[in-house]
């Protein structure tokens, strides 16, 4: 009995463990059974049962780790914002192809604007121009692309175009080159009403500015309006002028950036014989505003002097900023020349003063001055001009008759390039005694003149006495 009970207990425990193993085996997620291709229920393969000898063989696959599935909310990328195309013309009351054109000085500019559907008989277009200051904000225009509704043209503008000129206020101010009878015409408007183009024939500092397009019916001319800003730019012209210097003078060169607009930064960088000049004390730059734009002049002075080495070559590099993002850069080079310092002498020979200058450039002449008179003396003669042994130079001589009234003489060289100091020589000479015969003649002439004057005075006095005597006698007779 005891042994039977023990055997029964062992059997039950064995069956329990077999059942647990079978349950765990069937519950394994990695165990799959492949039975041909998937299909409808009518095409499904028969069940895999050991009783069915013709059943297909099952192929177990190794267990695969489960893949963690992410929620769509965590993996989905944010959708890009929908692309918005240009607004349809039909939904906009005004649309211009360019609201802020920038064009070169002297170019021809066209601006096209489209307005609501209308007919010629009931619509009216006006275009007004407003001047803008240099580098100023838009001013009266709140936004270049904003459509103004029921807003009249602000005061202070000049009328450029009116599609109904017979309705134009007679007190309106037309812009130069616009209006009836304007010649030459600076503005023209072409195209059908509602799809018109404004043509600025020549863009200048005077024709740039803010243009206000105002559109409406004849009985409501300010229904819609829009602003267009027209800006002009003009690159600078660059020239370099290396100064001619005398021996002993420092080398110099001047660069000029002329007639550019707008007047943003124009920066110069100087190079002397290929080496940059960093000392600000050697560079002087000045900007000036002119009616046709701006001009900047920059001058560099070298530490080297003429005659102590070869001539210097200067290069100026100009960087002009058209706006905050655009700039242009140009270079100009030139070599300074050295002129010999002339020797000037003065001597008095007889009745003439003679001035001589050696080794002066061709084309240089003398100018004479006497005493404190700032006007050159008239009687000047160049006696001779000979070579002095240096190419392009000569020795010149000038003579001047001596003066009987002045004692101070100045002979000055004229015709040197700009920047050369005044070169002159001062001399003194006492007036020579006059010839005795000449003195006698002068005295005789002076005596004759005095005698004639006395005679004329006597004749006039006698005539006056006779006239007064005759007048008194006539009056006496009338009284009797």
From Swiss-Prot:
Keyword terms of this UniProt record: Disulfide bond, Glycoprotein, Host-virus interaction, Immunoglobulin domain, Inhibition of host complement factors by virus, Membrane, Signal, Transmembrane, Transmembrane helix, Viral attachment to host adhesion receptor, Viral attachment to host cell, Viral immunoevasion, Virion, Virus entry into host cell
Membrane topology value: Single-pass membrane protein
Ranges in the topological domain labelled Virion surface: 28-447
Positions of the Ig-like domain: 236-328
Keyword Glycoprotein applies: yes
Primary localization: virion
Region entry Heparin-binding domain, spans: 106-120
Region of interest: Disordered: 30-101
Cytoplasmic side: 469-480
Biased composition (Low complexity): 37-58
Ranges annotated as spanning the membrane: 448-468
Disulfide bonds listed in the record: 96-113, 255-316, 355-411, 359-388
Pfam families reported for this sequence: Marek_A (PF02124)
Glycan-linked positions: 40, 52, 117, 150, 166, 331
CC terms in the record's Gene Ontology section: membrane; virion membrane
Miscellaneous notes: There are seven external glycoproteins in HSV-1 and 2: gH, gB, gC, gG, gD, gI, and gE.
Family: Belongs to the herpesviridae glycoprotein C family.
Subunit and interaction comment: Interacts with host complement component C3b; this interaction inhibits host immune response by disregulating complement cascade.
Descriptive protein name: Envelope glycoprotein C
Species for this entry: Human herpesvirus 2 (strain 333) (HHV-2)
Upper lineage: Viruses, Duplodnaviria, Heunggongvirae, Peploviricota, Herviviricetes
């Amino acid at each position: 009995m005891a042994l039977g009970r023990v055997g029964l207990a062992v059997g039950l425990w064995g069956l329990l463990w077999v059942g647990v193993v079978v349950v765990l085996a069937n519950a394994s997620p990695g165990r799959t059974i492949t039975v041909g291709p998937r299909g409808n229920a009518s095409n499904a393969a028969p069940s895999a049962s050991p009783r069915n000898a013709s059943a297909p063989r099952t192929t177990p696959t190794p267990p695969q780790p489960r893949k963690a599935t992410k929620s769509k909310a965590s993996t989905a990328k944010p959708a890009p914002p929908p692309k918005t195309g240009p607004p349809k013309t039909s939904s906009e009351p005004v649309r211009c192809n360019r609201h802020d054109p920038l064009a070169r000085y002297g170019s021809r500019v066209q601006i096209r604007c489209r307005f609501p559907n209308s007919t010629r008989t009931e619509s009216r277009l006006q275009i007004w121009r407003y001047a803008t200051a240099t580098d100023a904000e838009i001013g009266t225009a709140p936004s270049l692309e904003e459509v103004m509704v029921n807003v009249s043209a602000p005061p202070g503008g000049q009328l450029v175009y009116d599609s109904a000129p017979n309705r134009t206020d007679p007190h309106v101010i037309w812009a130069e080159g616009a209006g009836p009878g304007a010649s030459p015409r600076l503005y023209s408007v072409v195209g059908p009403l509602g799809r018109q183009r404004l043509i600025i024939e020549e863009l200048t500092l005077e024709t740039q500015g803010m243009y206000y397009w105002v559109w409406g019916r004849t009985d409501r001319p300010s229904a819609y309006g829009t602003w267009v800003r027209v800006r002009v730019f003009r690159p600078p012209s660059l020239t370099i002028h290396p100064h001619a210097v005398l021996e002993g003078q420092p080398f110099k060169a001047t660069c000029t950036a002329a007639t550019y607009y707008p007047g943003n930064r124009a920066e110069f960088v100087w190079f002397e014989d290929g080496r940059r000049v960093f000392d600000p004390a050697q560079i002087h730059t000045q900007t000036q505003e002119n009616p046709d734009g701006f001009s900047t002049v920059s001058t560099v002075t070298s530490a080297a002097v003429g005659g102590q080495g070869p001539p210097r070559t200067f290069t100026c590099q100009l960087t002009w900023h058209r706006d905050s993002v655009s700039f242009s850069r140009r270079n100009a080079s030139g070599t300074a020349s050295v002129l010999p310092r002339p020797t000037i002498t003065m001597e008095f020979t007889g009745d003439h003063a003679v001035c001589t200058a050696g080794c002066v450039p061709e084309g240089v002449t003398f100018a004479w001055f006497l005493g404190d008179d700032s006007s050159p003396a008239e009687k000047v003669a160049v006696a001779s001009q000979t070579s002095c042994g240096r190419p392009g130079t000569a020795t010149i001589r000038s003579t001047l008759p001596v003066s009987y009234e002045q004692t101070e003489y100045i002979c000055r060289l004229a015709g040197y390039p700009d920047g050369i100091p005044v070169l002159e020589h001062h001399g003194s000479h006492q007036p020579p005694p006059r010839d005795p015969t000449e003195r006698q003649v002068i005295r005789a002439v002076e005596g004759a003149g005095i005698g004639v004057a006395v005679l004329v005075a006597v004749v006039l006095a006698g005539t006056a006495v006779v006239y007064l005597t005759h007048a008194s006698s006539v009056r006496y007779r009338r009284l009797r």
